[in-house]
């Protein structure tokens, strides 16, 4: 049985009065992580060798996820970088690249794969899980606006620049909710009940409205304190991820 599609998912993109200035404090989150016992594996469950594919956010590349990558490896998981390139292209193209990486990780480990996506990367992860649930052990989103894009005006301006570039390739609806590609239709689809979810958010998010980053379900939504940018290096987020992965084991298929 599938869970409901994201409630209130909006196809348009709207500005949100979020505190962008707070993102300048992201360095404090990184320092807090380094000072936290969770960063060194204290008080969290060990991994079982299952794969976890990390997906970067809008305009980002895999490289800023290396801190999270190393931490997961130290815990005993088998992390993979997404290999999608810069997250500033046609969503369907990015989704196909992500699928290739997930299939590689699935074949190497012989079991479904965890997906951990930051911001727009989490939306790509949810879309893939909805379309190919047999490949996915669980989905973790970190500040991902999967209920509709409500962002700071400067973020929407950057999105429009990407859209203009893609339009030159004769894809007028790309980077909008009106696109009917598999990536967008997958985001609108119901998430299968077989795929456990974790939605990490912060009410001090300076990039997106935190209200579009949650399922409105206390069983899946976890609030942390910090910035949007540094959700990939937030001690509260790391603790929630470790707890979620330990609970979300999927059996190895024959």
Predicted regions and their residues:
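Flexible, membrane-associating and regulatory peripheral segments of lipid-active enzymes
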Residues: 1-53, 64-70, 75, 108, ...
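Generic, low-specificity signal for short hydrophobic/alpha-helical stretches with a mild N-terminal bias
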Residues: 6, 10-13, 37, 47-50, ...
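Generic structural signal for short, flexible, solvent-exposed coil/loop and linker residues
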Residues: 9, 19-22, 44-48, 54, ...
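Contiguous hydrophobic segments
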Residues: 16-37, 43, 117-133, 145, ...
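Residue-level signal for well-ordered alpha-helical segments
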Residues: 29-35, 42-45, 49, 56, ...
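Serine-dependent carboxylesterase/thioesterase catalytic core
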Residues: 51-63, 67, 73-188
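Helical cap/lid subdomain of alpha/beta-hydrolase-fold lipid enzymes
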Residues: 130-254
């Amino acid at each position: 049985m599938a869970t409901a599609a994201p409630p209130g998912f909006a196809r348009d993109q709207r500005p949100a009065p979020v505190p962008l200035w707070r993102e300048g404090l992201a360095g404090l989150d990184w320092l807090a992580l380094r000072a936290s016992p969770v960063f060194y594996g204290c008080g969290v469950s060990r991994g079982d060798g299952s794969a976890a594919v990390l997906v970067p956010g809008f305009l980002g590349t895999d490289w800023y996820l290396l801190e999270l990558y190393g931490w997961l490896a130290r815990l005993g998981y088998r992390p993979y970088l997404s290999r999608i390139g810069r997250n500033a292209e046609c969503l369907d193209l990015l989704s196909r690249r992500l699928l290739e990486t997930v299939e590689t990780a699935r074949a190497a480990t012989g079991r479904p794969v965890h997906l951990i996506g930051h911001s727009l990367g989490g939306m790509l992860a949810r879309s893939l899980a909805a379309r190919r649930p047999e490949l996915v052990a669980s989905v973790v989103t970190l500040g991902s606006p999967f209920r509709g894009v409500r962002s700071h005006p400067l973020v929407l301006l950057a999105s429009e620049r990407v859209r203009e570039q893609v339009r030159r390739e004769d894809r007028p609806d790309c980077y909008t909710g009106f696109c009917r590609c598999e990536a967008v239709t997958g985001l609108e689809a119901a998430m299968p009940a077989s795929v456990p979810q974790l939605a990490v958010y912060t009410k001090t998010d300076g990039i997106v409205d935190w209200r579009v980053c949650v399922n409105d379900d206390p069983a899946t939504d976890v609030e942390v304190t910090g910035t949007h940018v540094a959700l990939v290096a937030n001690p509260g987020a790391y603790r929630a991820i470790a707890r979620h992965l330990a609970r979300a084991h999927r059996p190895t298929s024959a």
